[in-house]
Amino acid sequence: LWQAPAHSEGQGMSEVRAGDAFAVYGLLRAGESGFAQFGLEQAFAPLGPCLLTGRLYDLGAYPGLVEGEGQVVGEIFEVRDPSVMPRVDAFEDYWPQDPARSRYERRKVRLIEPDRDAWVYVWVLGVEGARLIESGDWFKR
């Protein structure tokens, strides 16, 4: 069951604001290449582990979260500096002005734990041939 946010703000087209929660599950997790590349230790304040609803697929060099039943392990942060988001969107191949080019979409979803809304990147292309990560944890693939 894909959990919709408590209040929808047009899904991926809304602006990320300072104070918003952001959940990550792959290369943007602490210790991974994307986290360091964008200086997220300054832009994002860590809030701890989180669980998201969905399925996680190994897409080669990175994972993709797709809608569906299951749990995905991630980390939740509070956004301190939203000016980093256009660069992070580009890294995630999310183009808000040109969705047809996008591999991911940034959406606000309801987390399983903690029980709150958070932004997350959701894979929007097919997963044919990709391996399901049964544990739901990119670090335990």
What residue ranges belong to the model's regions?
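Glycine-aromatic micro-motifs
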Residues: 2-5, 9, 13-141
